[in-house]
Amino acid sequence: MIPLLMGAGISLALVMIGTQLFIRLLIRKGYGQFIRDDGPTSHHTKRGTPTMGGAVVIGTVILAYLLTHLISWWINPKAPGPSVSGWLLLLLMAGMGLVGFLDDFIKISKQRSLGLNAKAKLILQAAIGILFAVLAINFADHNGRTPATTKISFARDIPGLDLAFAGAGLGVLLFVIWANLIITAATNGVNLTDGLDGLAAGASVMVFGAYTLIGIWQSNQSCGSPRAVSSTVCYEVRDPLDLALLAAIIFGALIGFLWWNTSPAKIFMGDTGSLAIGGAIAGFAILSRTEILLAIIGGLFVLITLSVILQVGFFKLTGGKRLFKMAPLQHHFELKGWAEVTIVVRFWILGGLLVAIGLGAFYAEWVVF
């Protein structure tokens, strides 16, 4: 528990300081957010606000992860070092952040709303997702456990649902496709949510808080752990405590970033941050074997994504009519006259309730047990 608190504290402090310095740098360089003319008129005042703040979050998370392990090793030379699961999650987070950075940089340098086109963005996301999935299904430990598995999971692996039903080769291929669906959905879900000051960062804080608790519990009830209640209900998740550490570090980093990102925002996370955060959330779901549960824990991102899908589908089916005043959903309420802060806080409440329901679903079997 001490390393988790230490990691969260280090990342919080580093982001608080680093973001302020980054804001000054971006202002000096003239790197500000471009605002679309067809968006809510209230957003025009945000034109020129520094963006790409996600770069600070990504860099801080990596640094805090290494520092926490270094300090833990200095205190106790027998303390475990960075895990394969930890490195894989950082790879996915940084890789998606790089895609977002390219998108942000094109927008800023050319002062337009379009960065990478949709096809290029999806291709880059898929390439990183494939690399992550292939690596995650390899690197077995001495117990034969790989960071990820071909089994489909809810709060744990679902009996009888294994993508390797027709052999290992097909199982790996199907897992790569399955993992990429989760990664693409999560990254774009967070990206769509990042439309109001503090909305995506605040909602993500609660999700990473949930994965911190999940990782701690999975570690305590890990197969082979002396604290496990029973070998029949233990978890076979690889490196759960290190995943909990990373979740706590990202939790702290986002709280620090939220200090500067809350309304009126001094900096935006940009696609650099939203894609990185979405990638990390997907990584936690895959590596902690809670893939379907993510639809509840990250339910706010699901609802906002669905609002876009419904808007586009309704528009095409009705020949130009709109279901919402504007999509994503948060902009619909803006155009209805809700204050930005009101929308953000109410969406946080909704997101928090969904996280609580997700945690309840995760722990439900233990209440019954």
Swiss-Prot record:
This protein's UniProt keywords: Cell cycle, Cell division, Cell membrane, Cell shape, Cell wall biogenesis/degradation, Magnesium, Membrane, Metal-binding, Peptidoglycan synthesis, Transferase, Transmembrane, Transmembrane helix
Catalyzed reactions: UDP-N-acetyl-alpha-D-muramoyl-L-alanyl-gamma-D-glutamyl-meso-2,6-diaminopimeloyl-D-alanyl-D-alanine + di-trans,octa-cis-undecaprenyl phosphate = di-trans,octa-cis-undecaprenyl diphospho-N-acetyl-alpha-D-muramoyl-L-alanyl-D-glutamyl-meso-2,6-diaminopimeloyl-D-alanyl-D-alanine + UMP
Location in or out of the cell: Cell membrane
GO cellular component: plasma membrane
Top EC class of this enzyme: transferase
GO terms (BP aspect): cell division; cell wall organization; peptidoglycan biosynthetic process; regulation of cell shape
Any one GO MF annotation of this record: phospho-N-acetylmuramoyl-pentapeptide-transferase activity
Membrane topology recorded in Swiss-Prot or TrEMBL: Multi-pass membrane protein
EC code(s) of this entry: 2.7.8.13
Pathway: Cell wall biogenesis; peptidoglycan biosynthesis
Cofactor: Mg(2+)
Pfam families per record: Glycos_transf_4
Entry's transmembrane regions: 2-22, 55-75, 82-102, 120-140, 163-183, 196-216, 240-260, 267-287, 292-312, 349-369
Family: Belongs to the glycosyltransferase 4 family. MraY subfamily.
NCBIfam families linked to this entry: mraY
Protein role: Catalyzes the initial step of the lipid cycle reactions in the biosynthesis of the cell wall peptidoglycan: transfers peptidoglycan precursor phospho-MurNAc-pentapeptide from UDP-MurNAc-pentapeptide onto the lipid carrier undecaprenyl phosphate, yielding undecaprenyl-pyrophosphoryl-MurNAc-pentapeptide, known as lipid I.
Official protein name in the record: Phospho-N-acetylmuramoyl-pentapeptide-transferase
Species name: Renibacterium salmoninarum (strain ATCC 33209 / DSM 20767 / JCM 11484 / NBRC 15589 / NCIMB 2235)
Name of the gene encoding the protein in the UniProt record: mraY
